Structures are given as structure tokens and as C-alpha cells.
Amino acid sequence: MSWIIFYTIIFALLVLDLGVIHKKNEVMSFKQSLLFSLFYFTISCLFGIYIYYNMGADSTREYYTCFLIEKAMSLDNIFVISIIFQFFKIPQKYQHRVLFFGIIGVIAFRAVMIYGGIILINKFSWLLYIFAVILIATGVKTFYVSHKTFDIQNSYLYKSIIKYLNVTPNLEGDKFFVTRNKKLYVTPLFISLILIEAIDLVFAIDSIPAIFAITNDAYIIYTSNIFAILGLRALFFCLAEIVERFSYIKYSLALILIFIGIKIFIHHYIAIPAYISLTVTITLLLLGIFASVIRKNIVDRQ
């Protein structure tokens, strides 16, 4: 029943998104994007209340912790998506179409990765320690790397698409496919969709291990992941400006990853409750936001 409720909510949100709010290829303003994202955030929080009444307080804390971590870790994803759109010169009015169908792929691929990960961890518990090393290494690296980049032209996937598929030289409106001389062609819009799906899989390799350190409950992991990604895609059109304002969040994220990695290593000796993980996550994110605001105010005064 819980899965039916979740998928009903997601289906309703997708219908509302494509069938009502974005029925026409109109450019979303900063304010509209912000309000739409706030709407998604509210739905995500309300779903946490549903989890509280059906699964208990600990599961609720795990849900919110996973949600916040996935939200924070997906920020770099937005920059790479921007690079892809710029490379293919995708107009803003068509970008939402790509993001929407990208969500459909995310819903499917994340399910496979999460369930596959849970099966592997249940069978080989030592994998968690490998995840811990990856998380700590990623956290340390985050202090030294500004944003993840993506060399599209030299990527294996892009070269393979160009080599094996018929590709139109220019966009064909909002179409992913066109037929010419009885041959099927893919458009740059479709290639951008494939690359965005591939990038999401790459980023999931970073974020999902962090979630496994919080809980191995498939329902908590999957629902928090999907709600976080839905809200982030809604915020895409104003996120670049927001991330620029909150530039220190990446350091908060680095500390969160290191904390989670350490938590895995010590869990046999010290059991860290779900409420502490949630408190640490919220505190570090808020510190990153406050530090960013203070820094921006200082810069603006100079």
C-alpha cells in the first residue's frame, strides 16, 4: 500500500508538471521556478509526516537525512546539466522537456541501483567499508575541487552516439526523433537527454553509498532520492544563482560525507542514532548557508 501511495503521488506530480504547468514550451521565470520547487519541497516534507505515522520516528529521521544529503549532493549535477545544455545550444523553452523525461529515466535507474546495492550489501556486508573509504575520499576531494566537469566532445558515450546513430545537425523544435528519407534520426535534444541520464548514474555512484550508511530500508532510500531529485529539477532554472549565493555549502557537504564515512567504520563500537545523523546533517548545511550569506554581505560591501 505504501508503494502505491508513493507512486500515485509521483504520477500526479508528473501529470501536473507536464500536463498543466508546462503544457506549452514556456520559459519559467526565477520566481515561478522558486515557487514550484517550494511546492515540491512541501510535498516531500508532508511525505515525511506520512512515514512518521506509518513507520515511526526513526524511519522519519532517516528519510529526512537521506533527503537532505541527496539534495545537497545533487547540486553539482545541475552544473553539468547546464554544460550539456550550453554545448548543444538547447533553448530554455525546451530544457524542461529534457529534464522531465530525464526524471522518468531516473525513477527507473535509481530503483535498479538502490535494490542492486541493497542485495549486494546484504550479501557482502564488507562493501560498506569500501563505500566508507569512497565517501571520506570524496569529502576530502570536495575541499579542493570547485565543481565536477564533463568533457562532452571527448566522452565515450557522445562519440558512440555520433558514430552509430543518425544525428541531425540542428535542433528540430522540441522533437527527440525525426524521419528523413525513411531513416530515423536523433536530434541534439535527444543526445542531451541521454547524456543527462548517464551523468545522473555517475553522480548516483557518489550519493547512494552515502544513503546506504544511513539506512538499508529500500522504501526510505528510494522515496527520499526521488523526492530530492524532483525538487532539484524544478529548481534548475534558478539554482545556478542560488548555488552562487551559497558557495560554502560544498564544504558542509564534504564534512557530511566524512562524518558518514567515519560512522560506517565505528558503527560496531559506537551506534550513532538516526536523530544524531539528522542533527549533524542539518547543522552542517545551515552553517554552510550562514557562512555563505556572511561572505556575500562582506563582498557586497567592498
UniProtKB/Swiss-Prot annotation:
<feature type="transmembrane region" description="Helical">
    <location>
        <begin position="1"/>
        <end position="21"/>
    </location>
</feature>
<feature type="transmembrane region" description="Helical">
    <location>
        <begin position="67"/>
        <end position="87"/>
    </location>
</feature>
<feature type="transmembrane region" description="Helical">
    <location>
        <begin position="101"/>
        <end position="121"/>
    </location>
</feature>
<protein>
    <recommendedName>
        <fullName>Uncharacterized membrane protein RBE_0082</fullName>
    </recommendedName>
</protein>
<feature type="transmembrane region" description="Helical">
    <location>
        <begin position="124"/>
        <end position="144"/>
    </location>
</feature>
<dbReference type="GO" id="GO:0005886">
    <property type="term" value="C:plasma membrane"/>
</dbReference>
<keyword id="KW-1133">Transmembrane helix</keyword>
<dbReference type="InterPro" id="IPR005496">
    <property type="entry name" value="Integral_membrane_TerC"/>
</dbReference>
<keyword id="KW-0472">Membrane</keyword>
<feature type="transmembrane region" description="Helical">
    <location>
        <begin position="220"/>
        <end position="240"/>
    </location>
</feature>
<feature type="transmembrane region" description="Helical">
    <location>
        <begin position="274"/>
        <end position="294"/>
    </location>
</feature>
<feature type="transmembrane region" description="Helical">
    <location>
        <begin position="253"/>
        <end position="273"/>
    </location>
</feature>
<keyword id="KW-0812">Transmembrane</keyword>
<feature type="transmembrane region" description="Helical">
    <location>
        <begin position="33"/>
        <end position="53"/>
    </location>
</feature>
<dbReference type="InterPro" id="IPR022369">
    <property type="entry name" value="Integral_membrane_TerC_rswitch"/>
</dbReference>
<keyword id="KW-1003">Cell membrane</keyword>
<feature type="transmembrane region" description="Helical">
    <location>
        <begin position="185"/>
        <end position="205"/>
    </location>
</feature>
<comment type="similarity">
    <text>Belongs to the TerC family.</text>
</comment>
<dbReference type="Pfam" id="PF03741">
    <property type="entry name" value="TerC"/>
</dbReference>
